C-alpha cells in the first residue's frame, strides 16, 4: 500500500502527463516551477496568479463538485494545451491538489487528441500521477464525452455498495486494494461471494492515496457476505444478524475531499513572499486569493 510519505511527495510535484502537459496542485507552486510553463490553466475559484509576461494565465474558476458542468470548457482548455504543444512550450493544469479537476481535463484531452478510450486515457494520466481521482460527476461527464467521440463507452458508473457510486475502473482498483488489506480467511469468504465488481486486472491502483480502503473495510465489518447460487440475482452485502441491533445501515463510501477548508493553507511560503534581500523590486509574479472571484 502506498505510504503517506509517497502520497505527500506526489502532491508536491508537477506531474508530467505529456512533455507539453502537466498536472499539479497548489503545493507544488514556486517561482522556479512556474518559470517552466508558457500557460497555466487555473481551475481554482478565488485564486489569482499574477504571472510575468512570458506566461499566459487562463482563469476557469470551477468548483470540485459533482454537479459542476465541465462541458462548456473542454474546447477552451484543449485550445490552450494545443497552442503550448505547437509552440514547443508547456501547459500546466492547476487545481487545489491535482486530484480531480485538473486530472479530469487531462484525461479528456488525452481521450480527444490521442483517440484513446476513456479507460486507457485514465490509466495514462494515472500512470503519471497516481493520486488522481475525478469525482463521480466529472467521471460521468467523461463517459458522456467518450460516447460522443466514439459512439461507445469503456467505463461506467456502478453502485457496488449501497449508497456508493463509483466508476468501475476505480472500483476495480479499490477491490484489489481491499483484498490486499484482508486476512486470508476474509479473502476466502469474499471469494465465495460472486461480486460482479471483482477486479480482473493488475492495473496501477490510485485509491491508495484517498483512504477509501479503510472506509470500505469498515463498511464490510458491519455486514456479512452471502452465498448465492449461479443464476440468482446479485447479492452483495446484507446486515449481519449478530449486530443488527447496532447497525443502522451501510457506511457510505465517501470519496476523500480534494479541497482543503482553506486553500491558502497549502501554499508554500516560497510562493507567497519575495525572498530578495535587496530593495529592488525583483518580484515578477505573486499568488493571491480574491473574495470577489467566483
Curated annotation (Swiss-Prot):
Record bears the keyword Zinc-finger: no
Limits of the Tyrosine-protein phosphatase domain: 13-151
InterPro entries: Dual-sp_phosphatase_cat-dom (IPR000340), Dual_spec_Phospatases (IPR052103), Prot-tyrosine_phosphatase-like (IPR029021), Tyr_Pase_dom (IPR000387), TYR_PHOSPHATASE_DUAL_dom (IPR020422)
Signal peptide: none
Pfam families hit by this protein: DSPc
Key word Secreted present: no
Region described as Disordered: spans on this chain: 234-294
Keyword line: Hydrolase, Protein phosphatase
Any one Gene Ontology molecular-function term assigned to this protein's record: phosphoprotein phosphatase activity
Residues annotated as catalytic: 95
Family: Belongs to the protein-tyrosine phosphatase family. Non-receptor class dual specificity subfamily.
Official protein name in the record: Uncharacterized protein ZK757.2
